[in-house]
Structure formats: structure tokens, C-alpha cells
């Protein structure tokens, strides 16, 4: 607790210094530090397809990430979060067709294993995105379940001993809402897809599905992964925080048995009090959406020149989160792949961008930096693709540049 309170005090002390340093433009030489080997890290978020192309095909890949490990380490980052790398029919890859493989556009399982090994040699932890709330509509679990349901006679009930995959999703013999879609080839069955018709929701309360994801964890831990970023964790079961916490806890506990240093950070895109409730899962980190985003505490403090408001927010986070999990590790950020980049939010003001970055790095926990933030990359338009544009490596040299 003393450490966390100290981080809040540091914000007050450094706010003026960071701002003055940004305005004056005078740099200082920093000594290298020996960082403790724990789960307090500085993470760098990477959309692999837009990061660095190692083979000239226009697509970023795992080999490209490996080539840039020194760059990432020199930034002061000792953790990497890879956005989805599993096979998927979409560019963003949040709809998975195989949870135990690497999308061929990004490389191979051996490439991932080599990347993990190279990360560990440099003291970098490597975590990957796991979209467990839903699969792709092209996943064999879903296609086999749909084929089975389409073959049932009128009034016949599904039998999971005949087709176990009918229990893997939320199927119904009636359309229960606007997020339910007709099973292909059937006029009698529907399935839930909260985000999109091509992202059918998985039934994560099913012991069989939970077992599947334990096997998924085994696969990636064997390849060298150090942790998971859990996508859409608050949507596993809608409006069911306790059930979702239980789902997270079970998988995290299983992973910790395999690797005692295993790390998990979850996406709970909600207010501070809801995020606090998810710390009851016993998992270490939740992304702090109250601090991040265009209307978050960090940006507000920079816009208004008001460090006291940020300190008050930090103290509230520490109080509320620690009550649910005394060992929590906050996960603050400025922006990510689902929102406008921080440079856009701060209207490309270099002083404010640097101040925001400086404040982020003073916060307690493990801060997350979105690739390109360190050079003030921005984006135009509101489409998600615009938020995941190719990393800019040089104004003149196109080596490694992706096509996006």
C-alpha cells in the first residue's frame, strides 16, 4: 500500500517537471536499471499484421516482432502483448477458427516458440490475446453443431452425447432477442452472437468448454507464453459478474499450476466500480478504462493541467481494487486498438502527448503502451482499421513497412 500511495505522490511531484521538460525540450541521460523479475511490467501492445514485415509480403509477422525486440526493450518495455495471432477469417482475428495454432499469415508455431525464447533472453514477458467469449462461425465446433441441429426433425431435442458441440454454444429453439441468429440450414434453431453473427458466443459455463480452454492453455504455455489477455471478459455471461469472475478464476488457477509466474489481464470495459468487482476473480489485472480512454482520468488531468484530480482517482483505484484483491496489479493505458490514438485525442499537441506518457509511467501497476504511441502516431476516421494502421519506422526507408 505504501508503494501505491507513493506513486500517487510522485504524480504531484513530477507533473510540473514532466510538463516543463516537454516544453523546454531539454533531454536527460537516464541510467539503465535492473528491473525485478515479477509481474510488474511495462507492456507494449502490438497488432502483428501492422507492425513489422520480415519477409516483404506486406504483412507484419512474428519474425518481424522478433527483429524489433531491441527496439521495444530500448523503449523501457519488458512485456509484450500480441493481439490475436490464432487462425481467423478476418483481419483483426478476434474470431478464432483454431485456438491451438498460429495464423499462417503471421508465421508458425515454431516462429512463436522462437519469439518467446528470444523475449525471455532479453527479460521480456510475452502475453497473447485470447478471444474466449466467442469463436468464429467457421470454427469446427460451431459448424459441426449447426450441421447436427439442421438435421434434427421437427420437435426433436438435441443430444450432446451424439454431438457434444451443441453444448459449446448458446443454442435455442426460439429467437430470444436481437443478438440471436438462425442456425444455417435450420428454421427451428437459433444461436447467440452478442458482437456479430459471425462470432457465436461460447457457453463458458460448460465443463467441456472449460476443459477445451485448459488444453488451449497447455498448448501455449508449452510454446513459452507468459500470460493471456482475456478479451471481452464481462460478456462471458451477460450481467453476471460473479459467474464471469468464476470463469476467469478457474482458468487462471489452472495456468498458475502450470507456471507460477503466469500473468492474466482482462478487458472489462466498464466503470471503475465494475472493474473493481472483477478483481474478486483473484486474477491479477484489469485494464483501467476509468484512467484510460479519451475521457479518462489521465487525459482529463493533462487537458486541464490538474494533477490533483489524477491523484484522487489513483487513490480511489488503490482503495477499491485492493479491497477486492490485495495483490492486484493495475493496468493503466492511454489508448488501445479499439479507440482513437492518444495523439488524436490530444489534437497532436506534442507537449500534452509527452505529459500524458510521463504520467502513465508514474502510475502504479503495469502500464500498457499501444504501438506507435511512442512516436506520436495518429489515425484518421472512425473505422477500427484506422486505429490499427501500419507502424511508421522511417520517413524514407520502407524496409519492414506493412501494407495495413
What do these predicted regions represent?
Residues 218-221, 336-338:
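Catalytic grooves of carbohydrate-active enzymes
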Residues 34, 38-39, 258, 312, ...:
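Loop/helix patches that line or flank the sugar-binding groove of alpha-linked glycan CAZymes
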Residues 268-360:
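Noncatalytic carbohydrate-binding groove/subsite architecture in carbohydrate-active enzymes
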Residues 154, 194-195, 241-257, 261-263, ...:
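Extended substrate-binding grooves/exosites of carbohydrate-active enzymes
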Residues 22-203, 208-211, 222, 229, ...:
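Acidic/aromatic-lined carbohydrate-recognition and catalytic surfaces
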Residues 4-24:
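Sec-dependent N-terminal signal peptides of Gram-positive bacterial secreted proteins and lipoproteins
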Residues 45, 81, 227-230, 265-267, ...:
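Short beta-strand segments
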Amino acid at each position: 500500500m505504501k508503494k501505491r500511495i507513493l506513486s500517487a505522490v510522485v504524480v504531484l511531484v513530477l507533473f510540473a517537471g514532466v510538463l516543463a521538460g516537454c516544453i523546454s525540450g531539454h533531454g536527460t541521460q537516464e541510467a539503465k536499471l535492473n528491473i525485478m523479475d515479477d509481474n510488474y511490467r511495462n507492456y507494449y501492445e502490438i497488432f502483428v499484421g501492422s507492425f513489422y514485415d520480415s519477409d516483404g509480403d506486406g504483412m507484419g509477422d512474428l519474425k518481424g516482432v522478433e527483429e524489433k525486440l531491441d527496439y521495444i526493450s530500448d523503449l523501457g518495455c519488458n512485456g509484450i502483448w500480441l493481439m490475436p495471432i490464432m487462425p481467423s477469417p478476418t483481419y483483426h482475428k478476434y474470431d478464432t477458427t483454431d485456438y491451438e495454432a498460429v495464423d499462417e499469415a503471421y508465421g508458425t508455431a515454431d516462429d512463436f516458440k522462437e519469439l518467446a525464447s528470444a523475449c525471455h533472453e532479453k527479460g521480456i514477458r510475452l502475453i497473447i490475446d485470447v478471444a474466449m467469449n466467442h469463436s468464429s462461425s467457421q470454427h469446427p465446433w460451431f459448424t459441426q453443431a449447426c450441421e447436427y441441429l439442421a438435421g434434427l426433425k421437427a420437435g426433436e431435442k438435441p443430444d450432446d452425447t451424439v454431438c457434444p458441440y451443441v453444448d459449446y454454444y448458446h443454442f435455442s429453439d426460439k429467437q430470444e432477442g436481437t443478438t440471436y441468429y438462425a442456425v444455417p440450414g435450420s428454421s427451428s434453431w437459433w444461436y447467440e452472437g452478442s458482437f456479430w453473427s459471425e462470432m457465436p458466443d461460447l457457453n463458458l459455463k460448460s465443463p467441456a468448454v472449460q476443459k477445451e480452454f485448459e488444453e488451449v492453455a497447455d498448448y501455449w504455455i508449452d510454446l513459452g507464453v507468459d500470460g493471456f489477455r482475456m478479451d471481452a471478459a464481462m460478456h462471458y455471461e451477460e450481467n453476471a459478474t460473479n459467474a464471469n469472475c468464476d470463469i476467469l478464476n478457474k482458468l487462471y488457477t489452472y495456468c498458475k499450476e502450470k507456471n507460477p509466474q503466469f500473468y492474466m489481464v482482462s478487458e472489462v470495459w466498464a466503470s471503475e466500480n465494475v472493474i473493481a468487482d472483477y478483481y474478486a476473480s483473484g486474477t491479477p489485472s484489469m485494464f483501467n478504462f476509468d484512467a484510460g480512454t479519451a475521457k479518462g482520468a489521465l487525459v482529463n488531468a493533462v487537458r486541464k493541467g490538474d494533477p490533483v484530480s489524477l491523484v484522487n482517482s489513483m487513490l480511489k483505484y488503490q482503495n477499491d481494487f485492493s479491497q477486492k484483491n490485495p495483490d492486484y496489479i493495475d493496468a493503466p493505458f492511454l489508448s488501445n486498438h479499439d479507440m482513437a490514438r492518444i495523439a488524436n485525442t490530444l489534437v497532436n499537441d506534442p507537449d500534452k502527448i509527452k505529459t500524458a506518457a510521463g504520467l502513465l509511467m508514474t502510475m502504479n501497476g503495469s502500464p500498457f503502451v499501444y504501438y506507435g504511441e511512442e512516436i506520436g502516431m495518429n489515425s484518421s476516421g472512425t473505422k477500427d482499421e484506422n486505429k490499427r494502421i501500419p507502424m511508421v519506422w522511417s520517413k524514407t526507408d520502407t524496409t519492414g513497412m506493412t501494407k495495413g
